[in-house]
């Protein structure tokens, strides 16, 4: 009886192995974190913001994924110089952008470890001003979105990602355009690790 149980268990394992091997396909979606660089071109001089963000995507088919991402850029104290001929005054700014975008990613090379892609996303960008800590500033930025302080944004971009098994790195470069009395173009670059599942 014991021999038959062992043989039945071994037979079951042999039947299950092909389906387990097939289940190791990493083409269902991705989740990742990234460092965010945002060049705010509306002011003179331009302001370079750096922050962090997260992204999740689900594949509709091997070449198309739907993604959502959010990034928060930490305060950047920059200085504007005003001169009235006699004195010069330096004014710090504690602006903190919050980006939230959603849209498709069209990828080429879905079966290879390196993929190129283009993306087109829509969403919002919110500029909050706070001298609080990063955690409290993030809460303030989220509250600003619900208060109507967010601006409509579009993001056309392109990038490349490479994977070794389920773990990889991704680089995006694009133009985050928000609308405030006209279109405002801003360079945006993200880079970070991703996990396929």
Residue positions per predicted region:
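Short catalytic helix/loop segments, enriched in acidic residues and glycine
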Residues: 49-57
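Gram-negative and organellar
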Residues: 23, 100, 140-142, 158
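Short N-terminal segments immediately surrounding and downstream of signal-peptide cleavage
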Residues: 25-42
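Surface-exposed extracellular loop regions of Gram-negative outer-membrane beta-barrel proteins
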Residues: 157-171
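Low-complexity, intrinsically disordered Gly/Pro/Thr-rich segments
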Residues: 173-178
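Gram-negative (and chloroplast) outer-membrane scaffold detector with strong preference
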Residues: 32, 37, 57-137, 152, ...
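Cleavable N-terminal export/targeting peptides
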Residues: 1-26
């Amino acid at each position: 009886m014991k021999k038959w149980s062992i043989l039945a268990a071994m037979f079951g394992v042999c039947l299950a192995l092909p389906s387990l091997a097939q289940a190791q396909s990493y083409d269902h979606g991705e989740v990742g974190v990234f460092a965010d660089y945002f060049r705010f071109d509306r002011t003179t001089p331009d302001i370079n913001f750096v922050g962090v963000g997260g992204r999740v995507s689900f594949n509709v088919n091997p070449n198309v994924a739907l993604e959502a991402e959010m990034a928060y850029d930490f305060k950047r104290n920059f200085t504007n110089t005003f001169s009235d001929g006699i004195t010069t005054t330096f004014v710090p700014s504690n602006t903190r952008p919050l980006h939230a975008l959603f849209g498709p990613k069209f990828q080429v090379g879905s079966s290879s470890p390196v993929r190129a892609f283009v993306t087109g996303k829509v969403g919002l960008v919110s500029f909050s001003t706070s001298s609080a800590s990063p955690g409290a500033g993030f809460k303030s930025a989220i509250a600003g979105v619900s208060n109507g302080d967010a601006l409509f944004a579009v993001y056309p971009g392109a990038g490349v990602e490479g994977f070794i098994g389920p773990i990889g790195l991704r680089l995006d470069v694009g133009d985050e355009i928000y609308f405030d009395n006209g279109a405002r173009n801003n360079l945006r670059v993200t880079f970070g690790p991703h996990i396929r599942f």
